Curated annotation (Swiss-Prot):
Family label: Belongs to the universal ribosomal protein uS11 family.
Matching InterPro entries: Ribosomal_uS11, Ribosomal_uS11_bac-type, Ribosomal_uS11_sf
Described function: Located on the platform of the 30S subunit, it bridges several disparate RNA helices of the 16S rRNA. Forms part of the Shine-Dalgarno cleft in the 70S ribosome.
A Pfam family it matches: Ribosomal_S11
Species of origin: Phytoplasma mali (strain AT)
GO biological process: translation
Keyword flag Cytoplasm: no
NCBIfam families for the chain: PRK05309.1 (NF003698), uS11_bact (TIGR03632)
GO MF annotations, alphabetized: rRNA binding; structural constituent of ribosome
Any Gene Ontology CC annotation: ribonucleoprotein complex
Protein name: Small ribosomal subunit protein uS11
UniProtKB keywords: Ribonucleoprotein, Ribosomal protein, RNA-binding, rRNA-binding
Length: 130
């Protein structure tokens, strides 16, 4: 028998970008963070689910903190220094992800809440009974 050698893709090249945008999407189940340049091209992304958190652990602030620090380290490798933050959603990881971005060395220039608010559209899901 013989082994098939896998070729490693080297399509991840280093970009020199000083200013970027961090899009943080927090839901009740997960936190997704995408860091883009000013044109909207994705530099790096991370989510709580992609880092191995499963089930209800994905929705914790700790999972959001780990996801945002992972994305911030990758953005720092691309030369990013400053970032604008657009945060969307009602999730638990809102503040934790912003704090983690700041602690990892990115300078936050502005924070915008772009959560969409319905003008009494769809009926919301039932409230959890606790």
């Amino acid at each position: 028998m013989f082994m098939i050698k896998k070729k490693k893709n080297k399509n991840k090249f280093k970009k020199n970008i000083n200013l970027g945008i961090a899009h943080i999407h927090t839901t009740f189940n997960n936190t997704i963070l995408t860091i883009t340049d000013l044109q909207g091209n994705t530099i790096t992304w991370s989510s709580a689910g992609s880092l191995g958190f499963k089930g209800s652990r994905k929705s914790t602030p700790f999972a959001a903190q780990i996801a945002s620090s992972t994305a911030a380290k990758a953005a720092l490798e691309h030369g990013m220094l400053k970032v604008e933050v657009f945060i969307k959603g009602p999730g638990a990881g809102r503040e934790a992800s912003i704090r983690s971005l700041q602690a990892s060395g990115l300078e936050i220039t502005s924070i915008r809440d772009v959560t969409t608010v319905p003008h009494n559209g769809c009926r919301p899901p039932k409230r959890p009974r606790g």
